[in-house]
Amino acid sequence: MNRTDELRTARIESLVTPAELALRYPVTPGVATHVTDSRRRIEKILNGEDKRLLVIIGPCSIHDLTAAMEYATRLQSLRNQYQSRLEIVMRTYFEKPRTVVGWKGLISDPDLNGSYRINHGLELARKLLLQVNELGVPTATEFLDMVTGQFIADLISWGAIGARTTESQIHREMASALSCPVGFKNGTDGNTRIAVDAIRAARASHMFLSPDKNGQMTIYQTSGNPYGHIIMRGGKKPNYHADDIAAACDTLHEFDLPEHLVVDFSHGNCQKQHRRQLEVCEDICQQIRNGSTAIAGIMAESFLREGTQKIVGGQPLTYGQSITDPCLGWEDTERLVEKLASAVDTRF
């Protein structure tokens, strides 16, 4: 009989289960308290109960655990310095959506060579998240794959659904199941209505198919996530200006949703020129000084060294520099955070 299925796949290996990985890298009581408390603080900021600003900042993607931990250690110092004005969360992105093809992130390809040792990638991701949280730094990530969230979601304080997946029904269902607040990016064309629709969908209860912690495919009923919000990331043109934010708030108001949002300084808002993140920062700081309460948070891409680099086989990588989108360097990061804290001071 002719085969009609699995004609374009080849088995590689079995995937470790979330339960097995959690046994190797368990959440300690201290980390559990830290994650729970940071989620609550973020929720209060997004609801307007806390006047401080949520600052999600870090490398475009994680590829080197040593450099990531050095960045986290430096970020913890900034957290301590500005904790009365800012809730600083480290961007720890392990999955990269690609427009066509390219490196898909630490989980998929931890060796950066197309070997796709996913079990090892999952282990590295969980190990790093534990270490960063043990430092006292909350973590943020994009939830892209429908399976990998089960391996790391217990260590995440804030999640994002990307511009390419905000319209996806299964990602909206996943967001309704997640235990952390979730931001939805506007579409790559700049359309914010799809993010508002995603917020509404994620607030509802859904039947959701997912592997459980033991790898058994399971039918879950979600209770809905009340902490969905828009991430203004720009599109064909930036959308961080005051009139753009007012228009987004009008749409939120139309559906009785909280008029609080997050502004992404990178991507479409910096027109893929990383140093323009500083210009976006100046504009947002002025809006905050002018009394804007809609801006609950910001996102920025920064690392130890400015810019980006290509992966070239046989050649060493520059330590602390991005291998995906270009990032601000550490000195600019310190300046950006200081400016944000100074602007938020006017809210008090």
From Swiss-Prot:
It catalyses: D-erythrose 4-phosphate + phosphoenolpyruvate + H2O = 7-phospho-2-dehydro-3-deoxy-D-arabino-heptonate + phosphate. Coiled coil: none annotated. It comes from the Bacteria. Keywords: Amino-acid biosynthesis, Aromatic amino acid biosynthesis, Transferase. InterPro entries: Aldolase_TIM (IPR013785), DAHP1/KDSA (IPR006218), DAHP_synth_1 (IPR006219). GO terms for cellular component: cytoplasm. One of its GO terms (molecular function) is 3-deoxy-7-phosphoheptulonate synthase activity. The keyword Amino-acid biosynthesis applies. The keyword Glycoprotein does not apply. SUPFAM superfamilies: Aldolase. This is Phospho-2-dehydro-3-deoxyheptonate aldolase, Trp-sensitive.
